[in-house]
């Protein structure tokens, strides 16, 4: 075990549309199936008037409850409400989004009759809790430690927010790793037996909501990322959107009605489009069939693979740009790539594959790893390495990842002065000496940015802090050392020191951009606990209700059984029948009763039925072997297999 008495460490691929969890066990990675038997779980959370649903249960009811079912939290995490991508997504999401403090997007849902607000971190934490529970059910132990993956092109705020989601979920996030790098581990272990010497591998990871390309060299268990590129807002969902818009227009043309204002109709259409998209990866044509889509109108429409490709061709072509950029940054020629590895469900689209094959001059693509599971697989390996589990096969692996965006600070005139170039191997540390811009300047404002543009206003402000107390001096005399330090999670710390006075100040890039404070996270952790106990309460209630229902129906069947019914005295039989009918009526009228009410009802019913049934068996005339006596208080099993008759010595 992890040597910490906390069960093994797990690897979680927290995806935009689906998530997946793996663990290192018996010298290999086990990808764990959920309670529905699926190895990937929808990244959906639904709120109803009586409970909270996560995963398959949430996605399955989305058409009935579109406005309170939240998905795509990954497209919100670490972003501002005013972000252009958030604004374009709002038009497509059925749930309500509002701007919270510091422009943080907040999701508004109705839960148990009250309006509640959740941040993207909280929604993501609920999915992480679900993934942890899936692993705990399989392993039979509690789990504390996890490695969580993020798109390689996630920026600092998105990484930090994902880490916060882990904290809210009560997990110790040992490491945040990049998805393509995790997939490369899966590829490397898969190929280990056969490969000799250095290999240049391009990982092409096109998922439900994000897109990454990473170029690595792999040799003898050393995975070195040379360059990474991508788009944190491009994936399968965008292809679905194009198809949905196409059919909304089609419906308008055929029926002169606009369904775009009806969340339920749109959701049913989207589900059908997602299914059609998958079908078109293996066949050339399919039909969308939805009964009573809108105003009682049935919608049947064919779609061909060619039409689907035409609707998305600009997006598919857009997928090739990061591939070129990645090769340029790594200063490599496309002919020097040994393997092109497909990761993410959207790489099953034939057109995407064809464009890649054409780009690499007819080179065959590597499809030997499972595109849905490779990322969780790699995360599970990394979790095993970090917790000292696993055999020598994995303990010798070394991961050298890079930072995806250049980091620097603003100098006079709004110029971006870069300290750490993009694609620098992490962890890394860089120092540079700056000075004051005007005479007797008492302090300097250090503004930290990430991005590739020459002017800071075109880049992303990560945070700022003041270094004050500089003694009066002419401009250019004070010496201020600024140090940028990136840890293994790709998260940045910046410190500044005035050489003459020894004045210091530092910042872990946090609160400036809607980052959660320690207190907020603590509060969310407590809320997560509260929701968990509410979920458990609800489950208890459902179990108690089912137990009562089963008992009543089984008892009814028992006395209707001729063999038993005829052995009962008339008034006894009537007594049981009346009490059962009363119980069933009560059940129908009180579906939402409390757990203890169901339990009391159950006891009341048992106190009437059990003695009568027991008396009958004591007569020794029942079909079974006659027992010398009967335990009066035998409770029926909660599973409700009817009155449980035990032999007593």
Curated annotation (Swiss-Prot):
Pfam families cross-referenced by the UniProt entry: HSP70 (PF00012)
Keyword check for RNA-binding: no
Broad class of where this protein is predominantly found: cytoplasm
GO biological process: response to heat; response to virus
Keywords: ATP-binding, Chaperone, Cytoplasm, Nucleotide-binding, Nucleus, Stress response
Induction cue: By heat shock and by cold. Up-regulated by virus infection.
InterPro entries reported in the protein's UniProt record: ATPase_NBD, Heat_shock_70_CS, HSP70_C_sf, HSP70_peptide-bd_sf, Hsp_70_fam
Compartment(s) where it occurs, according to its Swiss-Prot or TrEMBL record: Cytoplasm; Nucleus matrix
Annotated CDD domains: ASKHA_NBD_HSP70_HSPA1 (cd10233)
Region named Disordered: 619-649
Keyword NADP tagged: no
Coiled coil: none
Cellular component aspect of the GO annotation: apoplast; chloroplast; cytosol; cytosolic ribosome; Golgi apparatus; nuclear matrix; plant-type cell wall; plant-type vacuole
Example GO molecular function: ATP-dependent protein folding chaperone
Assembly behavior: Interacts with GDP-mannose 3,5-epimerase and SGT1B (via SGS domain). Binds to the deubiquitinating enzyme AMSH3. Interacts with WPP1. Interacts with DEK3.
General function of this protein: In cooperation with other chaperones, Hsp70s are key components that facilitate folding of de novo synthesized proteins, assist translocation of precursor proteins into organelles, and are responsible for degradation of damaged protein under stress conditions.
NCBIfam families recorded: PRK00290.1
Similarity comment text for this entry: Belongs to the heat shock protein 70 (TC 1.A.33) family. DnaK subfamily.
Listed PANTHER family: HEAT SHOCK PROTEIN 70KDA
Stated name of the protein: Heat shock 70 kDa protein 3
Organism: Arabidopsis thaliana
């Amino acid at each position: 075990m992890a040597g910490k008495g906390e069960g093994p460490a797990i690897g979680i691929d927290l995806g935009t549309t689906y998530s997946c969890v793996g663990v290192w066990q018996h010298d290999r990675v086990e990808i764990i199936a959920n309670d529905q038997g699926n190895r990937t779980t929808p990244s959906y959370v639904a709120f109803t008037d009586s409970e909270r649903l996560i995963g398959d249960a949430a996605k399955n009811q989305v058409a009935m409850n579109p406005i309170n079912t939240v998905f795509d939290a990954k497209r919100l995490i670490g972003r501002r409400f005013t972000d252009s991508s958030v604004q374009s997504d709002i038009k497509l999401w059925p749930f309500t989004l509002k701007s919270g403090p510091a422009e943080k997007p907040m999701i508004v849902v109705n839960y148990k009759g009250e309006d509640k607000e959740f941040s993207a971190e909280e929604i993501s934490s609920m999915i992480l809790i679900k993934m942890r529970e899936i692993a705990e059910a399989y392993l039979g132990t509690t789990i504390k430690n996890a490695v969580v993956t993020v798109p390689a092109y996630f920026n600092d705020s998105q990484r930090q927010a994902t880490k916060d989601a882990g904290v809210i979920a009560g997990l110790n996030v040992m490491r945040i790793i990049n998805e393509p790098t995790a997939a490369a581990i899966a590829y490397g272990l898969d190929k280990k037996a056969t490969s000799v010497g250095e290999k240049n591998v391009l990982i092409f990871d096109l998922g439900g909501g994000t897109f990454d390309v990473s170029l690595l060299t792999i040799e003898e268990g050393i995975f070195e990322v040379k360059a990474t590129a991508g788009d944190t807002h491009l994936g399968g969902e965008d292809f679905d959107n194009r198809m949905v818009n196409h059919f909304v227009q089609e419906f308008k043309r055929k029926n002169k009605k606009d369904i775009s204002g009806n969340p339920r109709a749109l959701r049913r259409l989207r589900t059908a489009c997602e299914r059609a998209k998958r079908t078109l990866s293996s066949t050339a044509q399919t039909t969308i069939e939805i009964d009573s889509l809108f105003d009682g109108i049935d919608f049947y429409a064919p779609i061909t693979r060619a039409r689907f490709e035409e609707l998305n061709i600009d997006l598919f072509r857009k997928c090739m740009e990061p591939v070129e950029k990645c090769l340029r940054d790594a200063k490599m020629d496309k002919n020097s790539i040994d393997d092109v590895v497909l990761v993410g469900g959207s790489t099953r689209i034939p057109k995407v594959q064809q464009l890649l094959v054409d780009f690499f001059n007819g080179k065959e693509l590597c499809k030997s790893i499972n595109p849905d599971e490779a990322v969780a697989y790699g995360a599970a390996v990394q979790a095993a390495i970090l917790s000292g589990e696993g055999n020598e096969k994995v303990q010798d692996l070394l991961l050298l990842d890079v930072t995806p965006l250049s980091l620097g600070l603003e100098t006079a005139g709004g110029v971006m002065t870069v300290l750490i170039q993009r694609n620098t191997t992490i962890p890394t540390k860089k120092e540079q000496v700056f000075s004051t811009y005007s005479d007797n300047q008492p302090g300097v404002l250090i503004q930290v940015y990430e991005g590739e543009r020459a002017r800071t206003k075109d880049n992303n402000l990560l945070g700022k802090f003041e270094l004050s107390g500089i003694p009066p001096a002419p401009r250019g005399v004070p010496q201020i050392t600024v140090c940028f330090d990136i840890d293994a999670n790709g998260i940045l710390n910046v410190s500044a020191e005035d050489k003459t006075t020894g004045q210091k100040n530092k910042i872990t890039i946090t609160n400036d951009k809607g980052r959660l404070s320690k207190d907020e996270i603590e509060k969310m952790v407590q809320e997560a606990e509260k929701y968990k106990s509410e979920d458990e309460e609800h489950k208890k209630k459902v179990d108690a209700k089912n137990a009562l229902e089963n008992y009543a129906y089984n008892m009814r069947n028992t006395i209707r059984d001729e063999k038993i019914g005829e052995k009962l005295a008339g008034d006894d039989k009537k007594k049981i029948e009346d009490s059962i009918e009363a119980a069933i009526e009560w059940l129908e009228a009180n579906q939402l009763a409390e757990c203890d009410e169901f339990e009391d009802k159950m006891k009341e019913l048992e106190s009437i039925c059990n003695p009568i049934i027991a008396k009958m068996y004591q007569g020794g005339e029942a079909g079974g072997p006659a027992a010398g006596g009967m335990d009066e208080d035998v409770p029926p099993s909660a599973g409700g297999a009817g009155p449980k008759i035990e032999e007593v010595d």
